[in-house]
């Protein structure tokens, strides 16, 4: 968590590109992330659903609805919520249920387009979201190591390199015409 507060840790080009897409389709675009950091928000996104929680927040150990902004503060034994229960990081620990998954699943079932970025589709249950959209809905998977486990158009490039081009394409061509995706090339690094 402390490392995320370092000035060198900044959103990459993929975070910024996704924010551009959200800004164009305000109210119709939801970013679902497995990441517990705030890089999407710092990149400009505002409609973000954190499947595994948020590392800069704390919550009651008994009442998940009691959330508190942590910022750069640490949590110690004896730090209590207003109801007297121990505070804990607002993240999903190994073996715990993912409480935001049903919400993400329901939203995915009404999607017009699903873009999966930065995952090889091996982490469950989040990888199931790529399959949750109706069969006719186009899916784009962006990850150099993604395996063809779901019917999708695969862009096997690092997200920070290809997402700006993908978002430019979607903003220019629209969400319906994906025929030119195979022509996309990663942005050149300077």
Per-region residue spans from a language model:
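Conserved catalytic alpha/beta core of Sir2/sirtuin-type deacylases, generalized to analogous enzyme cores
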Residues: 1-190
């Amino acid at each position: 968590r402390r490392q995320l507060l370092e000035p060198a840790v900044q959103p990459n080009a993929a975070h910024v590109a996704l924010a551009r897409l959200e800004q164009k389709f305000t109210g119709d675009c939801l970013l679902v992330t497995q990441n517990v950091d705030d890089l999407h928000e710092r990149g400009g996104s505002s409609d973000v659903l954190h499947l595994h929680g948020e590392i800069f927040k704390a919550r009651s150990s008994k009442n998940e609805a009691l959330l508190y902004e942590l910022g750069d503060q640490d949590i110690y034994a004896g730090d209590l919520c207003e109801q007297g229960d121990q505070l804990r990081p607002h993240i999903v620990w190994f073996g715990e249920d993912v409480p935001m998954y049903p919400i993400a699943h329901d939203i995915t079932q009404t999607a017009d387009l699903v873009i999966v970025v930065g995952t090889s589709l091996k982490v469950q249950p989040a990888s199931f979201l790529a399959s949750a959209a109706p069969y006719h809905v186009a899916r784009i998977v962006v990850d150099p190591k993604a395996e063809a486990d779901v019917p999708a158009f695969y862009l096997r490039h690092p997200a920070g390199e290809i997402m700006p081009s993908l978002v430019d394409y979607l903003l220019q061509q629209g969400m319906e015409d994906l025929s030119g995706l195979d022509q996309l090339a990663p942005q050149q690094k300077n």
